[in-house]
């Protein structure tokens, strides 16, 4: 509230209007570029014409400007151009000259700085000149070195070319000296004459070469070694142990293949043919040759099969025994001459055995290998002498009479 409103006065004063000021950017005095602040001028207040009233006018008061804190400030002075005359605001609002700050620009400091800079400039100039001289010398030396290398390479190439030409000349002369002129082709008539007058010694020397060539052709074509090649191979066997060992290896491989083929086990027999599932060798049954079993790809009886199995069983544990191939099993079956018999093992007699004829025989002598057949000794591995029908019938009757 304005205090002027309450005063009793015959002069009317207009209430002051508040002027709004636009915020201006703050200008620092230490900046290089001078900043000028626009000062807003307040318009002059005009005196309001007096209102006619009945009150008497006591006095005339001249309208004057009212000073207020909101009035525009005085225009700032332009900062001096000389840096020494400028002012700088330091901490706590204290304003001092630039010469009094740490960045001082006094004459002494300027002189010291100028002398130091001159000395540094002089030293830098000398070092730069020395560096430039060294660079120039290095460049010059590098150029000279490159020229020398190019000259040396060119001279070496010329020398190599000269040496190559000389070597070619020497080689051509050498080949001309050692070259033998080609002989003319001999006509067939003259060749026959030369062969006619050839000495027998030369002919003997040429014949073995032709025989060897023919032997080689025979070996390549037919795979047969001719007698001429056998003689040479025998001589090589006696003189060359490596060749002898190679031949021995070939023969050993062949022997191993033969033994493996002979010792190969027979195919397993099928048990399907036995309906009852019982081993036929243990059955008490009268068999005939017509009902015998095929064994080892041949017709054989049960006794023959059992005898062969026993021999194989006895040989199995003897691993150090040399290989002895089994004798082939031959059947003595003749059509229309079948005879019934009992197997000896099935009968339970260990002292009796069957001979190779397939008949039951009892050993009556001490000699195990001889069997009395037809009143004469005969090895039991040999084939039996054919009997007459009468002798066979009589022998069968005697056999069954003894068994009863």
From Swiss-Prot:
InterPro entries: Sas-5-like_implico. Residues 192-214, 306-325, 376-404 are annotated as: Disordered. Keywords: Cell cycle, Coiled coil, Cytoplasm, Cytoskeleton, Developmental protein. GO terms for biological process: centriole assembly; centriole replication; centrosome duplication. The keyword Cytoplasm applies. Residues 192-201, 308-324, 389-404 have a biased composition (Basic and acidic residues). It comes from the Eukaryota. One of its GO terms (cellular component) is centriole. Interacts with sas-6 via its coiled coil domain. Interacts (via C terminus) with let-92 (part of the PP2A complex). This is Spindle assembly abnormal protein 5. It comes from Caenorhabditis elegans. The lineage of its organism: Eukaryota, Metazoa, Ecdysozoa, Nematoda, Chromadorea. The gene is sas-5.
């Amino acid at each position: 509230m304005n205090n002027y409103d309450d005063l009793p006065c015959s002069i009317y004063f207009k209430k002051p209007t508040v002027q709004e000021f636009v915020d201006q950017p703050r200008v620092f005095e230490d900046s290089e570029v001078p900043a000028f602040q626009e000062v807003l001028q307040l318009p002059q207040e005009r005196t309001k014409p007096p209102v006619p009233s009945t009150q008497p006018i006591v006095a005339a008061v001249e309208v004057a400007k009212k000073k207020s804190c909101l009035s525009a400030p005085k225009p700032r002075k332009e900062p001096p151009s000389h840096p020494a005359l400028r002012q700088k605001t330091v901490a706590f609002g204290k304003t001092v000259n630039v010469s009094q700050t740490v960045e001082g620009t006094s004459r002494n400091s300027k002189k010291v700085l100028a002398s130091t800079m001159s000395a540094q400039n002089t030293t830098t100039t000398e070092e730069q000149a020395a560096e430039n001289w060294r660079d120039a010398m290095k460049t010059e030396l590098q150029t000279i070195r490159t020229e020398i290398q190019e000259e040396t390479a060119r001279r070496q190439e010329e020398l190599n070319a000269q040496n190559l030409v000389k070597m070619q000349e020497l080689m051509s002369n050498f080949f001309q000296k050692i070259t033998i002129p080609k002989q003319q082709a001999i006509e067939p008539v003259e060749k026959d004459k030369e062969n006619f007058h050839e000495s027998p010694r030369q002919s003997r020397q040429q014949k073995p070469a032709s025989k060897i060539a023919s032997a080689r052709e025979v070996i390549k074509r037919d795979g047969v070694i001719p007698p001429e090649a056998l003689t040479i191979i025998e001589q090589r066997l006696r003189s060359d142990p490596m060749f002898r060992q190679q031949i021995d290896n070939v023969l050993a491989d062949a022997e191993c293949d033969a033994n493996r083929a002979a010792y190969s086990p027979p195919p397993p027999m099928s048990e399907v043919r036995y309906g009852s599932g019982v081993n036929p060798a243990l059955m008490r049954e009268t068999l005939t040759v017509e009902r015998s079993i095929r064994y080892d790809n041949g017709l054989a009886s049960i006794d023959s099969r059992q005898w062969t199995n026993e021999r194989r069983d006895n040989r199995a544990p003897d691993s150090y025994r040399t290989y002895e191939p089994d004798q082939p099993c031959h059947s003595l079956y003749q059509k229309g001459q079948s005879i019934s018999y009992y197997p000896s093992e099935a009968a339970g007699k260990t002292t009796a055995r069957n001979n190779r004829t397939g008949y039951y025989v009892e050993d009556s002598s001490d000699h195990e290998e001889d069997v009395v057949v037809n009143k004469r000794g005969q090895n039991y591995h040999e084939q039996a002498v054919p009997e007459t029908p009468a002798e066979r019938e009589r022998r069968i009757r005697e056999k069954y009479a003894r068994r009863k």
